[in-house]
């Protein structure tokens, strides 16, 4: 056979196969685009494990019609302009391949609008060909809907796993983003049902505790700078392990990466028995000029300019912080089961630290209390314990779309609406909620058997912010704490930990 140039359509299909392996990679590329578009709310919807559909909607900056048409062409990007830019990449995408590859091997719909546009642009695409361009309505942002992945590559289509396995891979891919971007609201639905809903959190560690529940049994957090690197992490104590590497997450400059080198460092420091693995979420920040992210189209493999420096710094950081094992394993044990008020405790001196924490001297050591977490739990329990909730009128114009059944369920808990179903105006809300909290609550809520708990959870946003507690509020909360013996806030974070005098003596080698 003579050598000849391949048709452009075939070249594009081959390139698409290198970037898009299964529905989870569609999800990955679309979420990365949303994050690069400065979205702070991203909704991922999949059907049949993503084999039928993957849809990602965001509230980012959107695209004009011209930009949308350009975005589906290969090697078009807004992230880099020159070869030099490859050495200082800060965005998730940069190759200009993802969207073009996706639309080559699927039936896709793109709806996008910028803040300046009066109407949104809608593109209908099949196998890389634009079949329809029209205008429609939507808020600023972008929705990309991908259906029938690999419909024009039957062998690849047939090689997809079962719907259950593809769903698991999509969820795992989704969680990689949720862990690193605590500044973004994430929602994940499968076949019309909400599977995950993660509101923004104060820090990355809170997100990790929400997703990786086994971390709560014992963990260590740290944040350090050394040798020009910034290393931050939340890792399990040596007693908390898994039988596989599923709890291992490495991020370099905010990008999830797979790295055997970093894995080896982690395993070396933990020195666990065979087939035991720690749970670890590690974030490494390096100078972009000392990092090559252009190793593979998937962008999950990176190469460090000075790999030994990175490995040594990570090893030192992990060793230093895991040496505090005695502290954390003691720190997150359950507090004494005796119900004491602060005044009744044998030793009740306490003081406030930075408006965030209370340090209480108890009989056998020091008790540290996170006042914000305690206040959240106090509000949550108080609301749940009420048999009926009072109402107050809403001053703003808040509209929500509800079915008749959803409306009736919400009315049982203090809401009232104008209208019977469909787009309803909120007239009254439970007395303990603010209008800001209600607007956020209605952005994403399932009306289910846990509705009362969800409303109470929304009310937790009314807790005094960390750093703003005074001694009067702290004293009242400590009384509640010693009477109720709360262990965790409604989100699962620990409220307190105790250091015994015996452990202090051991640490100082007395």
UniProtKB/Swiss-Prot annotation:
CDD domains for this protein: HATPase_MutL-MLH-PMS-like, MutL_Trans
Pfam families per UniProt: DNA_mis_repair, HATPase_c_3, MutL_C
GO cellular component: mismatch repair complex
GO molecular function: ATP binding; ATP hydrolysis activity; ATP-dependent DNA damage sensor activity; mismatched DNA binding
Keywords for the protein's UniProt record, in alphabetical order: DNA damage, DNA repair
Disulfide bonds: none
GO biological process, one term: mismatch repair
Superkingdom of origin: Bacteria
TM region(s), chain numbering: none
Family: Belongs to the DNA mismatch repair MutL/HexB family.
Function: This protein is involved in the repair of mismatches in DNA. It is required for dam-dependent methyl-directed DNA mismatch repair. May act as a 'molecular matchmaker', a protein that promotes the formation of a stable complex between two or more DNA-binding proteins in an ATP-dependent manner without itself being part of a final effector complex.
Record PANTHER family: DNA MISMATCH REPAIR PROTEIN MLH, PMS, MUTL, DNA MISMATCH REPAIR PROTEIN MLH1
Protein name per its UniProtKB record: DNA mismatch repair protein MutL
UniProt organism field: Thermotoga maritima (strain ATCC 43589 / DSM 3109 / JCM 10099 / NBRC 100826 / MSB8)
Gene name as annotated: mutL
